[in-house]
Structures are given as C-alpha cells and as structure tokens.
Swiss-Prot record:
Taxonomy, superkingdom: Bacteria
GO cellular component: cytosol
The protein's role, per its UniProt record: This reaction introduces a second double bond into the aromatic ring system.
Pathway terms, separated by semicolons: Metabolic intermediate biosynthesis; chorismate biosynthesis; chorismate from D-erythrose 4-phosphate and phosphoenolpyruvate: step 7/7
Alphabetic keyword roster: Amino-acid biosynthesis, Aromatic amino acid biosynthesis, FAD, Flavoprotein, FMN, Lyase, NADP
Protein name as annotated: Chorismate synthase
InterPro entries associated with the record: Chorismate_synth, Chorismate_synth_AroC_sf, Chorismate_synthase_CS
Residues annotated for FMN binding in this entry: R125, S126, S127, N239, A240, G280, K295, P296, V297, A298, T299, R321
Length: 355
C-alpha cells in the first residue's frame, strides 16, 4: 500500500490502524536545532483526541506522544523524528458484525477489492484515527514556521452557518466551546443541533474555514505544485472531506471580472483579497483563507442496508463509538495539514534563497 507519505522537504509518513497496537509516524526534513515545545504538541493532541465532549465519539484515548528519535536535549537534530501513539481503548468486538459485510459510504468494499484483505476493526487504516499522527507532524511544523499563524474554526453544521467574515471574528473564542466556532451564538445553535442529531442515531456534516496569516510572498511552485493545489490535496486527504474552495471560491464563478479583479495598493497589498492570498499559485503576502466541506459520518446508529461478501443485501445496525459530526474534532487536523504544507513550501523557498 502506497500513499502513506506527504511532502517534499518537510515530509511525514504515517503508519498504524484504528485498533492496532499503536499509530505513529516519521517526520523527515525537519531542520536541526529547533527547540521543541513538547507541551504544545500534546495540547494539539488534546484538541483532536476523542471523548472530549458529549458531541464527539466517547472512545477514551490519552493520545500521549512517545518520541523515539530525532530529538536530543529538547532540540531537533535534523535526523528523522520517529514517534508512536499507543492505542489503549479499542473495543474490536463492536465491529465483529461487519467482518463479512460492507457498510455504505465506507472504505470497506474498495479496500477489500483492492488489497484482498481488510482490517474491519474500526475501519483499520481508513479510520480517522490515522490523523492523530498528522496532528503531531503539524504541531512540529507550526514550530518550524512560528511567524506564520494558522487558525481554523467550524463555520457551519448542517444548514446552520456562521456568516460573519473572518476579519470580524475573535479566534481566541474558538476553543471556548465544544463546537470550536468563534461566534458563541452560532456555536450554541450548532451544538444543540448536533445533540438533536445524535439522539436520532443520525449524523450531520459541516464546513471548516482556515485562515493563514503573516505568509511571506513567494511560496508555491507553478505549474503543478501551486500553493492552493497542495493545500487542496492536503485537505482532500483528510477523512470525510468532500470539497475545498479558497478565496472567492465557487462564489467567484458568479461574478464579473470587473468586480472580481483584486487591484493593488501602492504598498503591494490588494484591496479585496478575493484571490485568497494566492495568485498564479504563489502566495502574495495577503491572508490565505479557504473552506473545507465534510460529509456526515457514514456510521449510523440506525438500521441501514449493507452488502455482504456473498452479494446479499441485509439490514444492519451500526455499533461502536462514533462522532455524530466530525467537524469539531477536525479543526486541529485541518490546521495540522495546513502547517505541514506551509512548512514544506517555506523550507523549499529557503533553499532557493540560499542559492
């Protein structure tokens, strides 16, 4: 199985399954002599971990990171950083009923057809538990590029949307509520809706907005490695993501060019930033902002039709511990992947500037 690595200079490879002994990763290309704040890394893990509120999965995992290499006396050595995160609260019996069946909108069927073997326990490698390793890498990436600020937040749940522009939001409020929405009135509505959906044994999707600030001009490699293309790839690699738009996004398709063009000020900044901080695939120094759409979680605590490995259609009820809505826990994952992309391009640009 390929496809387990991302990045050119700052590179992350992840391994492990949802119900295996441990998850882990190897970060290659991290510069030496960076003083790592290990507490900050663990805080990022706490943001992602299950069981943190009544509106997320109740699986209980400490998600403590154990570093194996690449760090000495609190500093990075420039060698590969290896780490593991032990799984301690697996309940594999919750998945015995799907051993011989394929749940709708899961990876069960395609994994078995492609590899002729499938770890059905909690989705195995296709589980969102894999993203714990990405959050570790993202937390380190943030410390590689401390001057670049990355803030993600929930901007919609179902049809409840936060319509304020991000410039009017106080990002410090994002972590003050279970939904991770910086507008408290909207957060309350979203949380109540998720609780209602959970009672029904159903799930709901939503969107996350991410804002990247203090970005230097020049990050991005046309033509195939444009900055927005890599951000899109990184976001679309996250479980349950169904869409990505940056800047004016799909709304820009409805506008006239005379309204959509982004004139320059004399200092090189732009007036509207409908470009979303990227032009020609290269950062222009303005804020980068994008939005990601997440589908409803596919596992329902309701009966639904499934296909068996003998090609029968039967009714089956979902078991186990699952998120009724993934977006609250996906916020640190989005930030992590954004940080990995930005650190990768930052280090690549540094190579150019040194020649």
């Amino acid at each position: 199985m390929s496809g387990n690595s991302y990045g050119k200079i700052f590179k992350i490879t992840t391994f492990g399954e949802s119900h295996g002994e441990a998850l882990g990763g190897i970060i290659d290309g991290c510069p030496p002599n960076i003083i790592l704040d290990l507490d900050a890394i663990q805080i990022e893990m706490q943001r992602r971990k299950p069981g943190q509120s009544s509106i997320v999965t109740q699986r209980k995992e400490a998600d403590e990171v154990q570093f194996l290499s690449g760090i000495f006396e609190g500093k990075t050595t420039g060698t590969p950083i290896g780490f593991i995160i032990k799984n301690t609260n697996q309940k594999s019996d919750d998945y015995s009923h799907i051993k011989d069946s394929y749940r709708p909108s899961h990876a069960d069927y395609v994994y078995e057809k492609k590899y002729r073997i499938r770890d059905y326990r909690g989705g195995g490698r296709s589980s969102a538990r894999e993203t714990a390793s990405r959050v570790v890498a993202g937390a380190i990436a943030k410390q590689v590029i401390p001057e670049i600020k990355i803030n993600a937040f929930v901007s919609s749940v179902g049809d409840i949307s936060l319509d304020k522009p991000y410039q009017d939001l106080n990002f410090s409020l994002t972590e003050t509520n279970a939904v991770r929405c910086p507008d408290l009135a909207s957060a309350e509505k979203m949380e109540n809706y998720i609780k209602e959906i959970k009672k029904q044994g159903d799930t709901v999707g939503g969107t996350i907005t991410c804002v990247i600030q203090n970005v230097p001009i020049g990050l991005g490699e046309p033509v195939f490695d444009k900055l927005h293309a890599e951000l899109g790839k990184a976001m679309l690699s996250i479980n349950a993501v169904k869409g990505f738009e940056y800047g004016s996004g799909f709304c820009g398709a409805k506008m006239k060019g005379s309204n959509h063009n982004d004139p320059y000020n004399q200092d090189g900044t732009t007036r509207t930033n409908l470009s979303g901080g990227i032009q020609g695939g290269i950062s222009n120094g303005m804020d980068i902002y994008f939005r990601i759409a997440f589908k409803p979680v596919a596992t329902l605590i309701q009966k639904q039709e499934v296909l068996t490995n003998t090609n029968e259609i039967i009714e089956q009820q979902g078991k186990g511990r699952h998120d009724p809505c993934v977006v609250p826990r996906a916020v640190p994952i989005v930030e992590a992947m954004a940080a990995i992309v930005m650190a990768d391009f930052f280090l690549l640009n540094k190579i150019y500037n040194n020649h």
